[in-house]
Amino acid sequence: MPEPHAVLYVTNELSHIVKNGFLPIWKLTGDESLNDLWLENGKYATDVYAYGDVSKWTIRQLRGHGFIFISTHKNVQLADIIKTVDVRIPREVARSHDMKAFENEIGRRRIRMRKGFGDALRNYAFKMAIEFHGSEAETLNDANPRLHKIYGMPEMPPLYMEYAEIGTRFDDEPTDEKLVSMLDYIVYSAEEVHYVGCGDLRTLMQFKKRSPGRFRRVLWHVYDPIAPECSDPNVIVHNIMVDSKKNILKHMNFLKRVERLFIWDVSSDRSQMNDHEWETTRFAEDRLGEEIAYEMGGAFSSALIKHRIPNSKDEYHCISTYLFPQPGADADMYELRNFMRLRGYSHVDRHMHPDASVTKVVSRDVRKMVELYHGRDRGRFLKKRLFEHLHIVRKNGLLHESDEPRADLFYLTNRCNMGLEPSIYEVMKKSVIATAWVGRAPLYDYDDFALPRSTVMLNGSYRDIRILDGNGAILFLMWRYPDIVKKDLTYDPAWAMNFAVSLKEPIPDPPVPDISLCRFIGLRVESSVLRVRNPTLHETADELKRMGLDLSGHLYVTLMSGAYVTDLFWWFKMILDWSAQNKEQKLRDLKRSAAEVIEWKEQMAERPWHVRNDLIRALREYKRKMGMREGASIDSWLELLRHL
């Protein structure tokens, strides 16, 4: 059966280009009815180009159809908003008539648009959940460390510890300058940072520009004789040389329970020193930083200390939890960073990191670390791994038990969880928001397996849990939480439909057939495909109709095709309660709810769309055909329908 497709809507100045392509082309006149649009879009099994007049349709209606907006202009006029285009085509590409360049531009932008989908779900989760499972750097970037608990199983960075493997080299890309990268991976939950050796504040100001939110939530005490005055109210400059803990302690208010971080990046000038004197000085400076941090261990949650590898020592000792390479450092910079876990208050539970202690360092091993991971062409993924390792609490979400509201985004169907489907459904049942991959097309960028859509529908819907495909979830949040998910959101609806999303939300009252619930693009085609490939699948339905009875073809084909994910509980309530009303009452409920639809049969407006027995017969027939293969309980739904 075909997978979800996108409608690649181009404005008129691009319509001549798409005629040179090989995808189908859909010309819109502006005179189409709701049903015309629904039936016509349902005939396409691949992405399709479209052009013409769409000004009478709303953004939610067009997103429900899978529209992506492409133009050389900034905006497209729709019925309810002026939509910022999703893909802005450079005018030189439009003038060139180069179809490959045009389609490459669309493809590159669509990959970036995936982030908009994930960010929208995370924005909802940040409002509703405390615990976040399966987390990576994207979650840390927007989490509130004072409120949210971030769990996951991120990839390990290269670390030096006694008797431990360093790790193997991995592909990497360039990143920010070394010291900006340092602040980027170490600053997360700390509210007060004491930064010794801050220099001329250029690094701190670059970090402020890169991450203004994290910069603003920290009180910075910066220490350096050359540090200039700073106008930022959260930066306090101390023009002193730090040589003992006394220089730091007098600037700390111990009546405040805050998380503190100590950064030591001290390096004096070489001046006239010979090699031996210079190395001795450097070694002493690094050890002094460790000693000051360790002596103040009860005041700081952690410390990050400059660590230069001596040339003349095969082995030496330092106080450390981990040594690790520096993202953005030159390939010949034989200098690491020393992370020390200390005993001070922390918002993040870092008990899985060992306490800082005296550690023996073998010089050749840490030199190898530099050779494997340093270089101006490297550092982006190293920085990401360090950020995640230091600030994400390492726990498997499938095994974690807690009473806190939780979010489980983009990890449940990782290949490592194959065979754990019962646990996945249990997590989706108790999560505030969870995602699972259901797409059947080949996956090139992710290591996920697909859950069957019909099983997800039957397993995932409860009185207080909605189960929708990803596009339905975004449309639902646009409708119910317009302050969280804006109508102008840029995302790829076809990509989103490859996910099932569970939301801890009640059934809307009244239970209207909003776009988020009822789209079923291509349902008629799916039904015809079933008939022309295996007519026995429709025999019972045909016989019932000859007898003057009926079954719900919508429900039956939805389950048999495995092409859709929608919420059964809400759908059944919609059929039995809302559709049983007359036309006037139906329209009144839609208006009162501010709901929108993309399918409307005028001949059914005064009648129920189905009755209870139609739904029961559809489920029974699905059970008869697929019950031995279906992993979900169908009997529980039959029992529910008898009493709903």
From Swiss-Prot:
- Asked if the Swiss-Prot or TrEMBL record annotates the protein with the keyword Zinc-finger, the reply is no
Provide this UniProt record's keywords sorted from A to Z. Answer: Capsid protein, Outer capsid protein, Virion
A GO cellular component annotated for this chain's UniProt record is:
viral outer capsid
Q: Main site of residence?
A: virion
The answer to keyword ATP-binding applying to this record is no
The places in or outside the cell where this protein is found are: Virion
CDD domains registered for this protein in UniProt: capping_2-OMTase_Orbivirus
The transmembrane residues are none
Question: What is the documented function of this protein?
Answer: The VP4 protein is one of the five proteins (with VP1, VP3, VP6 and VP7) which form the inner capsid of the virus.
Family assignment from sequence similarity: Belongs to the orbivirus VP4 family.
* Name assigned to this protein: Core protein VP4
Say which species the protein is native to.
Bluetongue virus 11 (isolate USA)
Q: The organism's lineage? A: Viruses, Riboviria, Orthornavirae, Duplornaviricota, Resentoviricetes
